[in-house]
């Protein structure tokens, strides 16, 4: 125990030195705590304060905010994380804070820890026992919290199965998305990723490792799923799987009228009287603002629109005097032995009742893996063009279905029409509230409406215009507030306690009680700015 306190003293001293002298570097923690002993994270080199470790951990995908940690832990196993948290909890006085970094894909510093410790979760993925395992009966997959969803997919496909619910981008960690919710086009029928978790291993703010599920330690299970890293870190998740299809017919349908677009989207996600759903396994949508950037936006949409197709859509918008056009994106999955004619017939039948513009249906046939990992190719192209590592002032909202037309008029046909250039996709699609578990920490719009929309305005500041884009986001939120649109922010970041209280609404008191129970010293995930 004496060695642990030497570790704490060294860390606090390092943090104070950084605060006093700036971010010019750090002193190796092992030098401050020279006594070697089994499990000493500092002496083993796993806990580092050098700039090569701390500077990369001070930034995230958003490229908007930065916060230098005092140290970074590179754990070899969950036991190293537990040791760090036990040491932090046992520290006298005001302990250091701890955050958990997967791919660093937060946009507003949610995974940063100014003057604290950032845990580099992906360090647990190297060596040792496999951290992704499909059950013998093919019912579930166990995955380490540090594992990427794309690797979970590949391991599961090798056994002929796959998780049911995804995010659009698979190069994120299991623990990262489950700490938020994890939404995509499958959410309408299977719920978010958190609704598909069977069991977790969690290390709490006490440094205690707990296995939890709906049957055992259910309060912690519900707290952690969608809990923004406030109650513990997920080191293992058991996720339900289903038989994996071989291929997908990937369809895009173009609309010039928002009412027809949203009505068809809601028709596609509506459950039948027996609770089942239609043949579409994935339903999303996109908005393309008319104007000089319309053709470029269309041609960057997954290869669906050729130059000639884009020109036709531009002409359609002009003929209808439309300020925006809309596209439903959907997939129909099928087996390897399905014939092209049978797939064509199934798609034709599924499209029969829809009201898209005649002649404006586009499709591709792809492997199931190619579809799910579709965004990665776009990332590679943007990376090569130097447009990936730019500021990303994203705005993600859950909007009640009854108010989505008001949002369209006020935002897509209003505020965004004054923007000089829009770089980044504008995504919009409905999901069913009944597929979400109200006991979990994630929040959805209040009220009894079954349908709400996921709206993701994924702006990229490619023209050094991040301040203007952030101001635009504030205008959008102010419009929603003044119009009484009862939205909830997804992947939220607020600067005041009052905003967080409003965000959680009826869940706030329970959220606070759970924080006091599982992280009473407020050690975990300080970058969320909820309790710190």
Swiss-Prot record:
InterPro entries: Cytok_DH_C_sf, Cytokinin_DH_FAD/cytokin-bd, FAD-bd_PCMH, FAD-bd_PCMH-like_sf, FAD-bd_PCMH_sub1, FAD-bd_PCMH_sub2, FAD-linked_Oxase-like_C, FAD-linked_Oxidoreductases_BP. It catalyses: N(6)-dimethylallyladenine + A + H2O = 3-methyl-2-butenal + adenine + AH2. One of its GO terms (biological process) is cytokinin metabolic process. The modification Pros-8alpha-FAD histidine is found at residue 105. It comes from the Eukaryota. GO terms for cellular component: extracellular region. Residues 1-17 form the signal peptide. Residues 65-244 form the FAD-binding PCMH-type domain. Glycans are attached at residues 52, 63, 133, 321, 432. It holds the Pfam family FAD_binding_4. Its EC number is 1.5.99.12. FAD binds at residues 100, 102-104, 106, 110, 168, 173, 179, 183, 234, 490, 525, 528. It is found in: Secreted, Extracellular space. Its cofactor is FAD. PANTHER family: CYTOKININ DEHYDROGENASE 1, GULONOLACTONE OXIDASE. Belongs to the oxygen-dependent FAD-linked oxidoreductase family. Catalyzes the oxidation of cytokinins, a family of N(6)-substituted adenine derivatives that are plant hormones, where the substituent is an isopentenyl group. Monomer. This is Cytokinin dehydrogenase 1. The gene is CKX1.
